[in-house]
Amino acid sequence: MAKTIVVKQIGSPIRRPADQRATLVGLGLNKMHKTRELEDTPSVRGMIRKIPHLVEIIEERG
């Protein structure tokens, strides 16, 4: 089974640059305090690293 991480949106995309909003959509997050379980890949880690002020890693599984 692949490693996964659980990510929670903690910041609002309002008044943020378009690329940061697009990164949130790419992670599957579109509303405050929603969580998403994602596969732990370098691309997902890079997206999280791009918007650390908007997301929080809740848990790492695997």
Swiss-Prot record:
It comes from the Bacteria. One of its GO terms (biological process) is translation. One of its GO terms (cellular component) is cytosolic large ribosomal subunit. CDD domains: Ribosomal_L30. Keywords: Ribonucleoprotein, Ribosomal protein. Pfam families: Ribosomal_L30. Gene3D superfamilies: Ribosomal protein L30, ferredoxin-like fold domain. Signal peptide: none annotated. The keyword Ribonucleoprotein applies. Belongs to the universal ribosomal protein uL30 family. Part of the 50S ribosomal subunit. This is Large ribosomal subunit protein uL30. It comes from Ruegeria pomeroyi (strain ATCC 700808 / DSM 15171 / DSS-3). The gene is rpmD.
